Amino acid sequence: MTQLDSRTEATTTRAFDQPRAEAAVRELLLAIGEDPDRGGLRDTPARVARAYREIFAGLYTDPDAVLNTMFDEDHDELVLIKEIPLYSTCEHHLVSFHGVAHVGYIPGRDGRVTGLSKIARLVDLYAKRPQVQERLTSQIADALVKRLGPRGVLVVVEAEHLCMAMRGVRKPGAVTTTSAVRGQFKTDAASRAEALDLILRK
């Protein structure tokens, strides 16, 4: 199986190794001093492996296959989808971070747009990988630039990281905000301000 860093896009199909994942979970249980053969834990390696297969499903999906539907709507104004729920996994501690993504773009001169559900699926695809929030935000923006050729893209992600809430500094409720700005939103302050105002407006 080709090993690829999650920062790069897969050019081949990866496969989840269920037996290897189960064996690794069993070893982890032993390492923390547990008995993986006791009743409550006997099926845990298989359950965790199946959960990881779902949680990291974005590793096995091509972003180009998600943004595969375009519509020639001759639309040249902002398209903004707010409050897209996301659940991801911090690659440093393998614990969850969760929150929302706001994704906006201004179609290119050809007026091409994609389906609204495709944007939500794109967020899911990149969230379902071992991640850092900064990279997640940029990957969503760059995928839209690549596939849609828009005049501008703005992505804002707000998330709470359980690695800060349940361990370490233990600051539950702290929210991290990241943004990725491309094209017209980067060069035109008025366009950027309009999009950010709509995002912040409840």
Swiss-Prot record:
SUPFAM superfamilies: Tetrahydrobiopterin biosynthesis enzymes-like (SSF55620). GO terms for molecular function: GTP binding; GTP cyclohydrolase I activity; zinc ion binding. Keywords: GTP-binding, Hydrolase, Metal-binding, Nucleotide-binding, One-carbon metabolism, Zinc. It catalyses: GTP + H2O = 7,8-dihydroneopterin 3'-triphosphate + formate + H(+). GO terms for biological process: one-carbon metabolic process; tetrahydrobiopterin biosynthetic process; tetrahydrofolate biosynthetic process. This is GTP cyclohydrolase 1. One of its GO terms (cellular component) is cytoplasm. Zn(2+) binds at residues 90, 93, 163. The gene is folE. InterPro entries: GTP-CH-I_C/QueF (IPR043133), GTP-CH-I_N (IPR043134), GTP_CycHdrlase_I (IPR001474), GTP_CycHdrlase_I_CS (IPR018234), GTP_CycHdrlase_I_dom (IPR020602). Signal peptide: none annotated. Homomer. It is an enzyme of class 3 (hydrolase). Pathway: Cofactor biosynthesis; 7,8-dihydroneopterin triphosphate biosynthesis; 7,8-dihydroneopterin triphosphate from GTP: step 1/1. PROSITE patterns: GTP_CYCLOHYDROL_1_1, GTP_CYCLOHYDROL_1_2.
